[in-house]
Amino acid sequence: MPAATNTERTSTRGRWLPAFGALLGAAVFLAVRGSLTDDAYITLAYAKNLAVHGEWGIVPGSPANSATSPLNVLLLGALTLATRVTGGPHPVVALGILTVLCGGVLGWAWQRLGRSLALPAAAGVLGVALVLLNPFVLSAIGLEVLLIPAVLLVLTVLAVEGRPAWFGVAGGLAVLTRLDLVVFVVVIAVSTPAIRRRLLPAAGFAVVTAAPWFAVSWVAFGSFVPDTLVIKQLQAGLFAPWSYGTGPVMYYLGWPVTVLVSFLPALLGVVALAGWAAARFGARWPEFPALGPLAALGAGGLLYYLTYSFLGVGPFHWYYAAPVTSVSAFAVAAFGTWYAESRTRTALRAGPPAVALGLTGALALGGAAVDVAQGLPWPSPVIFGNWASATDYARVGTELRGQLGDASVASPGEIGTLAYFCECAILDEFSDRGQAVTLVDKRIATANPLMSLALRVNYHWLDRSVTPRKPDYRLQYASGPATGPDSWQVRSAAKGVGHFVLTREP
């Protein structure tokens, strides 16, 4: 009877975690919905264009391949299409729904991990909170920053449960979320005996899930990989002398408290990973806790960080979502397992893991404090560098739509929010494939031999006959208040007062 009771308690532990994750997702979305970054609106513009016109691009009538996360756009596009039952498309509402769903998936994944590893329910709460309260993550809502931890945690759950077919499906969804997440898929697969023994079937399901999109992308758009890889590599100099590898230090100099509460859980995860490796391979433990897939998740985060440092991309803050959330997840799982083991093994003391969980919880609360200190709802993201607030960009974009008509305009350098609200031909490398082709050729010519070869293979089918479109107008940004006609004054928490000026091209 006691054994049956313990089994029943384990199977029902944390059943409320999916609801908790969904509710917390709804709460944070209500807080941030009016302060989305310009890059988030690039994704929303893609989703709107897909739902309304059935086109893959930022602006209608101009196909592009600058959506970093195909799965994010496809999900948002489908949800936006569903919102049309109320009239017009509502991509921001679709984003809210997806945020709630991601929160629920995180809760579900932690509930399953809790059942498999006998984790305390508090570990699941911490695991969800470290994602949904992280200021770096919330500052990039609209991009794939919630989809990444959701799909990676589901992938890990399926590895823990030894389900190779579904692991393959989740692996395919992971690379559709971001192609670079293949790092996690491979590391977790080869580190989990149940998956490794059935590697071919798992790989087959992954290919069946992801290959159709990549085949279409390679032929129709001339590239497996979104053009943003090339664009962001060429923009790395914007942050000079900082790089992706040193980016956390750069952000610490500007937002020290925010960086501490966002990155310290991952640092604890690195320490926990080293401790796990020492205990796992340095001594023979009877019935050692089955943390292998979760350790692989954390190791994947470290390898991802090293890979991005090697690629030479700039330290855009949303690029840290994958390593930070994955290594933080391992920290929670390791400390939770340590605590659970201490309750059944007399040789282990419960105090140290309880302190570790408490410290992790304090960091999650610190993240919440930073979020609340920003003001509710957020007037701007905590980590922010755009020239104008989302509200001001919306005003400028709406007025541009009436002024431009069918004419085209060169982007000032930030295109997402303007394109979303203007629904007009705003041109730059993100929306005009001709400009993207020019950048691709430049990157191939300047890359090292290995990168150049990879890019040549990737862009084998690229239509290089496409030339940049000539704009009818040009929109330019300058600091200070607006002073003349065809200008709009804006304000940004990062840049202060500035203005945009519209001029006719000769």
Language-model features: where?
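Membrane-proximal envelope and lipid/glycan-remodeling enzymes
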Residues: 3-506
